Structure formats: structure tokens, C-alpha cells
Regions:
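Conserved beta-loop-beta element that borders a ligand/cofactor-binding pocket
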Residues: 29-30, 67-92
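Glycine-rich "substrate-gating" loop/helix at the edge of Rossmann-like oxidoreductase active sites
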Residues: 55-59, 97-108, 123
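Catalytic helix-loop patch of NAD(P)-dependent Rossmann-fold dehydrogenases
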Residues: 4, 40-75
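Conserved Rossmann-fold NAD(P)-dependent oxidoreductase catalytic core, especially the SDR/UDP-sugar
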Residues: 12-53
């Protein structure tokens, strides 16, 4: 099922975009499309341009293959792909009970704003036809970096979620 949805689904999505002359696709995936356990456990300032290492998790592998399919389609077709990597969506008004805030957290409103920005960004301003962005709020531990989303999309998260990391 993971390959049918994530890998074949990416192929079908990109084929439909090319067939119907859609020039902008926003694809989504979990952060471990790029940064599996081998990165996540040992590194900091992980940015979306690192070499992909999704690890051995089936879901992460199938999403990573889907991302590669998107990239290949951009190389020979008039289509741009913006891939947004997410992990944990939070309502800033809900208490976080019995768990810590994950390093890749974002409010629903800030996530929605990232999509608006991706739909409005001038495609000629992007470095390539396939760009990957880490989408999360500014967090103090700096395990991951969202600087690329800020600089290329103008992303500026409003919900700090500081009530969960300011204990």
C-alpha cells in the first residue's frame, strides 16, 4: 500500500500535471524523506538540500522514491515541484499533555500560509524546477533549518509554540 500511494501516486500526479500542462505542483512528505534516523540522531542544522537518507522505514522510502520521481519529471518537462516536508501539526491553543514538542512542529495556520506562499512565488525566482522546503516554526534547538523556506518563499511562521518548549 505504501508504494501504491506514495510512489505510484507521485508518478500519477506528475504524469497528470504534464498531460494537463500544470506548471506548479506542491508535493508534501514527512521530514524523514531526507533525514532518517542516521541524520536525525547525530546532526543539527539539517537543511532540505542534504543528500537524502530516509533510512529503512517503508513509508519514508516510498515517499523518498516519490520525491525522486517528482524531481525526474521536472528535468524533462515544463513543471515545477515545491516539496514541503512536515512532521507534526499543532493547534497552539491545545495543551500538549504527556509528550514533548517534536523538532519539526508547526501550527495549522502557519502550514496553510506556506501553501499560499508556494502558490504565489514567482517560479523564475527558484534555483531549480524542483525545490524541497522544511516547513516548521522557529524552534530554539536548531536540529533542522527552515531558512530556505524563509528566503525563497518569504515564509515567516507566526505561531512560535513557545508554550511547549519554554518550560
Amino acid at each position: 500500500l505504501a508504494f501504491d500511494v506514495s510512489t505510484r501516486g507521485s508518478y500519477n500526479m506528475m504524469q497528470a500535471a504534464v498531460t494537463h500542462s500544470i506548471n506548479r505542483v506542491i508535493n508534501t512528505g514527512p521530514h524523514f524523506v531526507l533525514a532518517g534516523r542516521t541524520y536525525e540522531t547525530f546532526d543539527y542544522e539539517l537543511n532540505p538540500d542534504i543528500p537524502p537518507q530516509p533510512g529503512t522505514n517503508l513509508y519514508a522510502l516510498s515517499k523518498s522514491l516519490g520525491q525522486e520521481i517528482c524531481k525526474v519529471f521536472t528535468e524533462g518537462n515544463d513543471v515545477h515541484v515545491l516539496c514541503y516536508l512536515f512532521y507534526s501539526f499543532r493547534d497552539p491553543n491545545q495543551p500538549l499533555v504527556g509528550a514533548d514538542l517534536t523538532p519539526f512542529s508547526i501550527s495549522w495556520n502557519d502550514a496553510a500560509e506556506a501553501f499560499r506562499l508556494g502558490l504565489e512565488v514567482k517560479l523564475s525566482n527558484l534555483p531549480s524546477r524542483c525545490e524541497i522546503f522544511n516547513i516548521f516554526t522557529d524552534l530554539p534547538h536548531q536540529q533542522f533549518s527552515n531558512e530556505k523556506a524563509k528566503s525563497l518563499l518569504g515564509f515567516s511562521p507566526q505561531d512560535t509554540l513557545s508554550q511547549w518548549w519554554h518550560k
